[in-house]
Structures are given as C-alpha cells and as structure tokens.
C-alpha cells in the first residue's frame, strides 16, 4: 500500500531510521546532552521510601531556600511519581541502593533573586554508591543538574528504579535560550503558559519571550492605563491581571527562567489605539481622514508622555533587565498620507525618507526605556533601518533570507544578537522538521571570534495566528527540544541519528510528566499521554 505523500523508497528509508521503541528500559537518554558525560555499567537502585534529596554540609543554601525546597519536591515526584505500570515479580536485588542526592551550592546562592543574562547555570554531578553529589555555584546550576539527574534514572524490566554510576560536568553553550509565545493572536490561559514553562525546564530553556500584545488584542491589564485592556482585549475574560503576570513570573523564576515581555511598536499596535485616544496615526484618503489608523503617531508629545508612564509601569512589573520593544514591519503608507506628519517631516528635514521618522520614534523610545533602567531588545529591522542604537541593545534576527549575512553585519557593528530566523515553529511541514532545526548552528557565519562572542543565543518562535491552548503544546514539543539542545550542548554534538534515539525517549519522558508532546515517528511510550 502506498503511503500518501511518500514514495516507497522514502517510506522504507524512514522505517529503517525509526528509533528503538521508547520505553523506560531503554536506559538514560539525556536531553540536552551535557558537556561531559562518563557512565559506568555499574548499576544502583533507588526506592521512593529510602531515597531523599538534601544539602551537603558546606552548602550556602539550605532548608530556608524555598526555590530549592520546591525543586527537591518537584523532582522527587518526577522520578517516582509516575510509577503506574503493572510490575513483574521482583527480581533478587543484587544492586547497591542509592540512598541520597546531596546538593551543594558553593557561592552566594541567589536563592531569592531572579535569573538574568549572566546567571551561572553550570554544575557537576557525581553518582556513586551510596550517595550522589550535585555541586553548583548558584541555585540555577542546581536546577539544571536536578533535571539531568532525573533523566539518568529509569525503570528496568522489573519496574525497579535504576541508575548507572555517572560523572557529569555541564554548562550551557549560550546564555540566552528562549521560547517565544504569542498571546495576542490567540489568548493563552495562564495554565497553558505554566505548562509551557514546565516543558521549557525539562529542555533547559531559560527565557520566556512573552509577545503579550499585538494588533489583534491587548490582554495585558495595565494599572496605569486600564482602558488598554478594557477596550483592546478580545473580552474582559481574556486578560492577564497583575496577579496572573506575577504568577507566571514567579513560576518561571522557580524554574530558572526569565520572563521578557514584548510590547511591539510603532507598528503592530492597532489594539493599543482602542483604549488610548490619539495614540495612533489617522490615515488620510484624498485629503480626508479615512477612519482607519496606522502606526503610533510619532510627532505628538502626548505619545511620549504615554510611553514614559507605560514603560515605567512595565519596568516595575517585569523584573528582568530587558524589555523587547519590537520595531518590526512598520508600514509607512499611513504616515505618508497624513498632512501633519508630512509637515513634521519637512520641518525636521527628513525629506520623504520615512525610515528617518521611524528612527526618530525608536530613538526616543529607547531613551525612555533606558531612563527606567531597562535594556532593550529589538527586531532586526531597527538595525537594518539605521536607527541609532544604544550600546548593548540586543538585535533579534528573524528574517530567514540569508540570516548568516545579517548575523555578520550586526555583530560587526558591535551589537549582541539573538537568532530566531531558522526556528519559526509556526511554519509546520510534513515529516520530521525538527531535524532541520537541529542542524542549525548559530555561529556558522563569516565573522571573527570577537563577533561570534556577541551571539548570545537564540529563540524558537511560535506565533499564534493558528495556535491556541488546544495545540500549543504539541506544536512546540518536541520540535523546540531540537533548538534546546543546539543552544545548550557543545558544538560537536551534531549526530541526527543519535539525537533521534535520545529524543524519542525524551519525548516519552515529557509525555510521562504530563506534556502532550507530539510523536517524532511511529512507536509507543510505556506511559501514554492521559487527557
């Protein structure tokens, strides 16, 4: 029987490449692959009742660190809490039991702080009988090490929790490893966002890029300007209250994840205008107002008064040092049609180059954000249109046409870069497109070593035109996992075949933990997803 969309030869090739059936008995399958892994054939057993996670005697963090206490509870449950299989009769227990994981934080723990771009996520993990040791400079490394430790443990054919003696040294290749979610095209319930944060932690992502508002809706509930969401959201039940936002930020912090909001302007702002009078530019048709509106009006003082107050609030709500300001896809037609803007352009000597007007607006906005002690991230058009950027402004490269050239130009100008162009997960295709994401290397462009140091990482972007809570998780995972390993693991971890074998197991592990990750290909999981 011919498979629709595949020739016989292609189908046979796919079947030949299928991974071993992903079951717990497959042993540990680490994802993302650590920097250095040494494993021994010597096996240790664990039991729920006899195993515990505690602190080493020299640890700077202890039982008062709620972040770690919550993580210990969470990972104990991840390891033992899904043991629902019918077991075979127990075999004679010949292996030595692993009784404890001792965690040591070496430096100031940062237990009550928020993660940032320079947070230390490195750790070492030594698993030997009768006690395993996890050591990290900060709590952020402990979180990453706990995830790795949990992945080392599997159940053998008798259902016994088993781990190989192991010695692991690990740290991330890039400091910025993000997922973009879009809550403007479709509202995503807080529960869905929290589930995404769980999955991000399983894949060692550390940035949630929250594209929170756009043309279609303004669900962010501003205390200073409540009419923005009252009139700009889809409905009053489709908003994120201050408590909702705080819940997301704190849930992320407990998993070592930063939350960076994006308030894109001057374009992508139609929803803003519904609740903020005179913010948008009136468009004209044959010398009369057409009744439609374009980008934010860049020539009014009231615009910048509003932006100053709004971003002052944003700076207090979101603790991360960076705010994403967008700046992409600004359409100039409405500005061109408006006689007041034409007069302003003439007064400023801008001629008919509306990129200079865009630059005028964005430079003022960058200054406002700097005044509230925040750094800025912008989409690549802001750089391409020669806006004068403040030092340290991060440029996010998203256009897929020769993105390597864009990386070269931005880094040559001395600006840090986030790469997203090859990782737009909303562009779905038949088959195993995760392989294409996996093969990308952010540093494969023509540039000096100093330039390549400016590539701080990347993001997998899932835009929301066709995504809501019903398909958010399976569309993200495990496709985003491929990006996660590329951004965490060493440059020489490139074998797609090896990745496939590990990722099928990791996908089942996510399913076991309640993440509805879609399958990579044919096969099964010992713990199938329960709705």
Curated annotation (Swiss-Prot):
Gene Ontology biological process: carbohydrate metabolic process; ganglioside catabolic process; glycosaminoglycan metabolic process; N-glycan processing; single fertilization
Catalytic machinery residues: 329 (proton donor)
InterPro entries noted in UniProt: Beta_hexosaminidase_sua/sub, Glyco_hydro_20_cat, Glycoside_hydrolase_SF, Hex-like_dom2, HEX_eukaryotic_N
Pfam families: Glyco_hydro_20, Glycohydro_20b2
Principal subcellular localisation of the protein: other
Localization (cell): Lysosome; Cytoplasmic vesicle, Secretory vesicle, Cortical granule
UniProt-listed PANTHER family: BETA-HEXOSAMINIDASE, BETA-HEXOSAMINIDASE SUBUNIT BETA
Official protein name in the record: Beta-hexosaminidase subunit beta
């Amino acid at each position: 029987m011919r498979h629709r969309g595949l020739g016989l030869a292609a189908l046979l090739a796919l079947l030949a490449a299928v991974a071993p059936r992903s079951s717990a008995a497959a042993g540990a399958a680490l994802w993302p692959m650590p920097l250095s892994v040494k494993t021994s054939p010597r096996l240790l057993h664990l039991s729920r009742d006899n195993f515990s996670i505690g602190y080493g005697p020299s640890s700077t963090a202890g039982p008062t660190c709620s972040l770690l206490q919550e993580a210990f509870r969470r990972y104990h449950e991840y390891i033992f809490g899904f043991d629902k299989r019918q077991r075979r009769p127990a075999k004679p227990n010949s292996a030595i039991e692993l009784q404890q994981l001792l965690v040591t934080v070496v430096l100031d723990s940062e237990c009550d702080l928020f993660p940032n771009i320079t947070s230390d996520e490195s750790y070492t993990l030594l698993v030997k009988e009768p006690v395993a040791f996890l050591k990290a400079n900060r709590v952020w490394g402990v979180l990453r090490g706990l995830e790795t430790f949990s992945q080392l443990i599997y159940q053998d054919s008798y259902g016994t929790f088993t781990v190989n003696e192991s010695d692991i040294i690990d740290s991330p290749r890039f400091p910025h490893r993000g997922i973009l979610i879009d809550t403007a095209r479709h509202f995503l319930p807080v529960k869905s966002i929290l589930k995404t944060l769980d999955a991000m932690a399983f894949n060692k992502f550390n940035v949630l890029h929250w594209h929170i508002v756009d043309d279609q809706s303004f669900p962010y509930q501003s205390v200073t300007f409540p009419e923005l969401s009252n009139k700009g959201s889809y409905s009053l039940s489709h908003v994120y209250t201050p408590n909702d936002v705080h819940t997301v930020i704190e849930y992320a912090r407990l998993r070592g994840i930063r939350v960076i909001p994006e308030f894109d302007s001057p374009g992508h702002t139609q929803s803003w205008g519904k609740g903020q009078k005179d913010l948008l530019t009136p468009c004209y048709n044959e010398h009369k107002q057409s009744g439609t509106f374009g980008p934010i009006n860049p020539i009014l003082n009231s615009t910048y008064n509003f932006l100053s107050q709004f971003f002052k609030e944003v700076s207090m709500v979101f603790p991360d040092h960076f705010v994403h300001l967008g700046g992409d896809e600004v359409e100039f037609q409405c500005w061109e049609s408006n006689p007041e803007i034409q007069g302003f352009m003439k007064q400023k000597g801008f001629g008919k180059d509306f990129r200079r007007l865009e630059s005028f607006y964005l430079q003022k906005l960058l200054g406002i954000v700097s005044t509230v002690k925040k750094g800025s991230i912008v989409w690549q058009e802001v750089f391409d249109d020669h806006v004068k950027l403040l030092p340290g402004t991060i440029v996010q490269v998203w256009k897929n046409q020769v993105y390597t050239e864009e990386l070269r130009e931005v880094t040559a100008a001395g600006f840090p870069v986030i790469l997203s162009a090859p990782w737009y997960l909303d562009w779905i295709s038949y088959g195993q497109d995760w392989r294409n994401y996996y093969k990308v290397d952010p540093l494969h462009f023509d540039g000096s070593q100093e330039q390549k140091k400016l590539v701080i990482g990347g993001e997998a972007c899932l835009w929301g035109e066709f995504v809501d809570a019903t398909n958010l998780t399976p569309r993200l995972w495990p496709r985003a996992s491929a990006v996660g390993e590329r951004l965490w693991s060493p440059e020489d971890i490139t074998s797609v075949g090896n990745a496939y074998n590990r990722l099928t197991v990791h996908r089942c592990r996510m399913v076991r933990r309640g993440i509805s990750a879609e399958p990579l290909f044919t096969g099964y999981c010992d713990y199938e997803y329960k709705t």
